[in-house]
Amino acid sequence: MLVLVFLIGLSACFYVYYKVKGVRAKPSLAKEICSAKSSMALGSLVLFYGLNQMILFHSVLTLVIGGIFIVIGAGSAWAGYKAFRHYNPLHAKEAERDHA
């Protein structure tokens, strides 16, 4: 259970880090990449929280709510990953063009 608490805290730190980095970023593609990374971090936070609740408490309501959190968190992390994979090559081309 301590591992899940550590992962929840780490996910929260990454979420805040990428949100702040996204606000401070100048190019729009860099903002989109930071937004995608923060979406992955928030999704993992919700997923780990749901998993932690399911392990700690064994009532039917907790299992249902934990399952919902796991599904929502996994969906958010997956959507963030897909967005990151979409924007990363575009950002690399833009950076290559700017430095050439």
Curated annotation (Swiss-Prot):
It is found in: Cell membrane. Keywords: Cell membrane, Membrane, Transmembrane, Transmembrane helix. The chain crosses the membrane at residues 1-21, 54-74. Coiled coil: none annotated. It is a multi-pass membrane protein. Pfam families: YtpI (PF14007). Its main location: membrane. One of its GO terms (cellular component) is plasma membrane. Signal peptide: none annotated. It comes from the Bacteria. The keyword Manganese does not apply. The keyword Cell membrane applies. This is Uncharacterized membrane protein YtpI.
